[in-house]
Amino acid sequence: EGRVDCIVETPMFVYIFEFKRDGSASEALKQIEEKGYAREYATDNRTIYQIGCNFSSKTGTIDDWKSKASSNSLT
């Protein structure tokens, strides 16, 4: 169902990034959800961060970002 732009895994966390250019961070987060990029971590005990990031082609910088955290840990 598509490809995630970047995943970073550490012993305690999983970071799922979706990048947009001249879009919105909300649009990027929506894509993570709609495409099911976090699905393979549904039973993972680490905290999962979904991060939507938008780059502005006009300024060459990040102009918007949003994150959402979830945890499947029982502790």
Predicted feature descriptions by range:
Residues 9-10, 28, 37, 62:
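Generic hydrophobic, helix-prone segments enriched in Leu/Val/Ile
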Residues 6-21, 35:
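Conserved catalytic cores of phosphodiester-cleaving nucleases, focusing on short active-site segments
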Residues 21-38:
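Mg2+/Mn2+-dependent nuclease catalytic core
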